[in-house]
């Protein structure tokens, strides 16, 4: 599933690193990869 993970506490973790977003996307959205969209401070999951 692709898309932004929403406002479920990803803003702070996004500032820290992309790895957290990547892990969250794989675990919660069953996506293949995830990265931080810095301008919006949100995780984006791809695949």
UniProtKB/Swiss-Prot annotation:
<dbReference type="InterPro" id="IPR036574">
    <property type="entry name" value="Scorpion_toxin-like_sf"/>
</dbReference>
<keyword id="KW-1015">Disulfide bond</keyword>
<keyword id="KW-0964">Secreted</keyword>
<dbReference type="InterPro" id="IPR044062">
    <property type="entry name" value="LCN-type_CS_alpha_beta_dom"/>
</dbReference>
<dbReference type="InterPro" id="IPR002061">
    <property type="entry name" value="Scorpion_toxinL/defensin"/>
</dbReference>
<dbReference type="GO" id="GO:0090729">
    <property type="term" value="F:toxin activity"/>
</dbReference>
<dbReference type="InterPro" id="IPR018218">
    <property type="entry name" value="Scorpion_toxinL"/>
</dbReference>
<dbReference type="GO" id="GO:0019871">
    <property type="term" value="F:sodium channel inhibitor activity"/>
</dbReference>
<keyword id="KW-0528">Neurotoxin</keyword>
<dbReference type="GO" id="GO:0005576">
    <property type="term" value="C:extracellular region"/>
</dbReference>
<comment type="function">
    <text>Causes transient paralysis of the rear legs of and spasms in insects (A.domestica).</text>
</comment>
<protein>
    <recommendedName>
        <fullName>Putative beta-neurotoxin</fullName>
    </recommendedName>
</protein>
<keyword id="KW-0800">Toxin</keyword>
<comment type="similarity">
    <text>Belongs to the long (4 C-C) scorpion toxin superfamily. Sodium channel inhibitor family. Beta subfamily.</text>
</comment>
<feature type="disulfide bond">
    <location>
        <begin position="21"/>
        <end position="43"/>
    </location>
</feature>
<dbReference type="Pfam" id="PF00537">
    <property type="entry name" value="Toxin_3"/>
</dbReference>
<feature type="disulfide bond">
    <location>
        <begin position="14"/>
        <end position="36"/>
    </location>
</feature>
<feature type="domain" description="LCN-type CS-alpha/beta">
    <location>
        <begin position="1"/>
        <end position="47"/>
    </location>
</feature>
């Amino acid at each position: 599933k692709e898309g932004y993970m929403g406002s479920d506490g990803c803003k702070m973790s996004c500032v820290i690193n992309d790895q957290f977003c990547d892990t969250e996307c794989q675990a919660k959205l069953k996506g293949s990869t995830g990265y931080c969209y810095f301008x919006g401070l949100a995780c984006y999951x791809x695949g």
